[in-house]
């Protein structure tokens, strides 16, 4: 195999939110482009609130430390900080991990549907940038197929909750009931839309949507029967808001402790609850130090998630079995890639021999008409292909055996001398002398 497959990442289990936000990728396309310039053959990066993962296909001389060093440098961090918080998978372990991510078996909330959409979006961008090619294309399409199988053949999604649902459940734990409370969503993406739905179902009195693109805030507010808020007037509206759920894609905090100090004073110190489900975080952590202001981030949702976990454990076992099967299936395809150049060489050798023998035959026959020439050529080529049919079928079967691909490919290349090695004239002399005449 002349390539390696690596998947390097960090997630909610391996790193806290402070590390995740520091090494989040704010410009995935530029990140991928930089890796291609370093000599990586294919790359796709996924950056969400709970994980950053880099899938790479590269030549053996490019190593995992090379990729970590590039990642740390791009995020103005250090390998010494990044490495202890990451995990690295290679080969089929990388494939298996990707499949688990696609099925949301690796999510904070097992069975949640958002990750598949995020993965598809990352893949689309990698394709558009020319960063995803043969192997990543196949891996991602296979991962979508595996996710579909898991959702069709198990009930893992039926009891799943979303991050947005968990955020609203946390708000309920804080307030008891949400009737009469005024809520604001900062950000107008998919998570905000889901949060708005759950808040309305929980009986909030009023909901407002703040977004940098005001028209998007208006659209979501109209849909949800709420009001849109301009970012320019954000702090004025916070004075009248009890619950804030923030989920923008901003690379920096959008709520500062300095401004919130003024807001809480205007509220006469009535309690405010912020739930920040963005990574990088939207809300300055120092906000939590203000009187009667309570700030929770995405890592605080774990207790809500644990309550839902036991219902999905049996379904997760079934889902993991599907992942294992499809990972082995993908491994067979990878092995066939190693075999493909040898198959091409075999048929080229067969065609060359057929052409040589055809030329000799035509020379002996003398002048023949075009029809006879064509018939002889077809026969010569056909014999070559038919003679190779069984050896090629044998090779395909054998290379599907784990760990056997290189062994059988090497054997075939030597058997048919596809690399044009020079064979000594006396190579078989000893064998002839020792041969038993009775045999």
From Swiss-Prot:
Its EC number is 1.2.1.70. The record marks 97 as: Important for activity. Disulfide bonds: none annotated. Keywords: NADP, Oxidoreductase, Porphyrin biosynthesis. The keyword Oxidoreductase applies. Substrate binds at residues 48-51, 107, 112-114, 118. Pathway: Porphyrin-containing compound metabolism; protoporphyrin-IX biosynthesis; 5-aminolevulinate from L-glutamyl-tRNA(Glu): step 1/2. It comes from the Bacteria. It is an enzyme of class 1 (oxidoreductase). GO terms for molecular function: glutamyl-tRNA reductase activity; NADP binding. GO terms for biological process: protoporphyrinogen IX biosynthetic process from glutamate. Gene3D superfamilies: Glutamyl-tRNA reductase, N-terminal domain, NAD(P)-binding Rossmann-like Domain. Pfam families: GlutR_dimer, GlutR_N, Shikimate_DH. The active site is at 49 (nucleophile). NADP(+) binds at residues 187-192. It catalyses: (S)-4-amino-5-oxopentanoate + tRNA(Glu) + NADP(+) = L-glutamyl-tRNA(Glu) + NADPH + H(+). InterPro entries: 4pyrrol_synth_GluRdtase, 4pyrrol_synth_GluRdtase_dimer, 4pyrrol_synth_GluRdtase_N, GluRdtase_CS, GluRdtase_dimer_dom_sf, GluRdtase_N_sf, NAD(P)-bd_dom_sf, Shikm_DH/Glu-tRNA_Rdtase. Signal peptide: none annotated. Possesses an unusual extended V-shaped dimeric structure with each monomer consisting of three distinct domains arranged along a curved 'spinal' alpha-helix. The N-terminal catalytic domain specifically recognizes the glutamate moiety of the substrate. The second domain is the NADPH-binding domain, and the third C-terminal domain is responsible for dimerization. During catalysis, the active site Cys acts as a nucleophile attacking the alpha-carbonyl group of tRNA-bound glutamate with the formation of a thioester intermediate between enzyme and glutamate, and the concomitant release of tRNA(Glu). The thioester intermediate is finally reduced by direct hydride transfer from NADPH, to form the product GSA. Belongs to the glutamyl-tRNA reductase family. Catalyzes the NADPH-dependent reduction of glutamyl-tRNA(Glu) to glutamate 1-semialdehyde (GSA). Homodimer. This is Glutamyl-tRNA reductase. It comes from Maridesulfovibrio salexigens (strain ATCC 14822 / DSM 2638 / NCIMB 8403 / VKM B-1763) (Desulfovibrio salexigens). The gene is hemA.
């Amino acid at each position: 195999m002349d390539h390696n497959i690596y998947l390097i990442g960090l997630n909610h289990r391996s790193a806290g939110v402070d590390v995740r936000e520091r090494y989040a990728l704010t410009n995935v396309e530029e990140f991928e482009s930089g890796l291609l310039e370093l000599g990586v053959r294919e790359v796709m990066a996924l950056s969400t609130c709970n994980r950053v993962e880099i899938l790479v296909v590269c030549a053996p001389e490019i190593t995992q430390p090379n990729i970590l060093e590039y990642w740390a440098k791009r995020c103005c961090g250090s390998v010494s900080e990044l490495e202890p918080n990451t995990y690295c998978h290679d080969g089929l372990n990388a494939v298996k991990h990707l499949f688990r991510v696609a099925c949301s078996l690796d999510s904070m909330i097992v069975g949640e549907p958002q990750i598949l959409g995020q993965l598809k979006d990352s893949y689309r961008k990698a394709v558009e940038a020319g960063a995803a090619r043969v192997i990543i294309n196949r891996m991602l399409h296979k991962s979508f197929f595996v996710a579909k199988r898991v959702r069709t053949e198990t009930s893992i999604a039926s009891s799943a909750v979303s991050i947005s649902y968990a955020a609203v459940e946390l708000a309920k734990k804080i307030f008891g009931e949400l009737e009469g409370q005024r809520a604001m969503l900062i950000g107008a993406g998919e998570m905000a839309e889901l949060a708005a739905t759950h808040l309305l179902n929980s009986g909030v009195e009023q909901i407002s949507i703040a977004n940098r693109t005001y028209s998007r805030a208006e659209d979501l507010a109209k849909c949800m029967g709420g009001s849109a808020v301009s970012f320019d007037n954000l702090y004025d509206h916070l004075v009248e808001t009890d619950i804030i759920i923030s989920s923008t894609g901003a690379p920096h905090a959008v709520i500062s402790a300095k401004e919130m100090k003024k807001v809480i004073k205007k509220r006469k110190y009535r309690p405010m609850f912020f739930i920040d489900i963005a990574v990088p975080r939207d809300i300055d952590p120092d906000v939590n130090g203000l009187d009667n202001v309570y700030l929770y981030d995405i890592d605080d949702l774990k207790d809500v998630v644990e309550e839902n976990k036991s219902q999905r454990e049996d379904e997760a076992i079934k889902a993991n079995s599907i992942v294992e099967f499809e990972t082995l299936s993908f491994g067979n395809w990878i092995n066939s890639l190693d075999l493909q150049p040898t198959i091409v060489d075999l048929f080229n050798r067969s065609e060359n021999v057929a052409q040589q023998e055809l030329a000799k035959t035509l020379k002996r026959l003398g002048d023949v008409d075009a029809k006879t020439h064509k018939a002889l050529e077809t026969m010569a080529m056909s014999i070559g292909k038919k003679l190779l049919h069984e050896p090629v079928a044998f090779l395909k079967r054998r290379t599907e055996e784990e760990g056997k691909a290189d062994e059988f490919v090497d054997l075939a290349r030597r058997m048919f001398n596809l690399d044009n090695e020079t064979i000594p004239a006396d190579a078989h002399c000893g064998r002839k002398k020792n041969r038993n005449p009775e045999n």
